[in-house]
Amino acid sequence: MRKFSTYDLAQISLLACLIIVTGMFKIPTGIPGSEFQLSAPIAVAIAAVFGFKRYFLAGIIASLILFLLGIHSILNVEISIIFRLTVGLIIVLLGTSIPVLVVAGPIGTMVARLGLAFTLGTPFLPLFVLAIPGMVITAVSVYPITKMLYAINKKVAGDHHVRNVL
């Protein structure tokens, strides 16, 4: 296992900041109690472009910062970790093709809601139904965001870091 370079540390920190900032944008979906966080498709795109290790480390850092600042509760952290593990596992096992990216976010959201239902002891269906609009928006927006992040990463890092994401 290679050590992290200064470039890697800066990149992971910037990705954590991107997750934090986009997680604060909550877009109403028209259904009371349901909202969409822009960080979901960004997270899937980060996993696809930068690899699981950078994605997961950035996500852990983002969750830790938000928790320490009091912005997130332990339930928010639980949902985030379950989502990240699920999305990361799907992308590591199935690759970064468009169909995989489109379904990774909604599956991650569904599994995270299942974990939340288990933790709270509440029925899964109401939690899942409220998440459907956000899952649809995530599925639709993940491909353009992935293309954008890939283009930015290629211009900034060059081919060297693009090929060595894992």
From Swiss-Prot:
One of its GO terms (cellular component) is plasma membrane. The chain crosses the membrane at residues 12-32, 33-53, 55-75, 87-107, 117-137. Keywords: Biotin biosynthesis, Cell membrane, Membrane, Transmembrane, Transmembrane helix. It is a multi-pass membrane protein. Disulfide bonds: none annotated. Its main location: membrane. One of its GO terms (biological process) is biotin biosynthetic process. It is found in: Cell membrane. Does not seem to be a permease of pimelate. Its role in biotin synthesis is not clear. This is Protein BioX. The lineage of its organism: Bacteria, Bacillati, Bacillota, Bacilli, Bacillales. The gene is bioX.
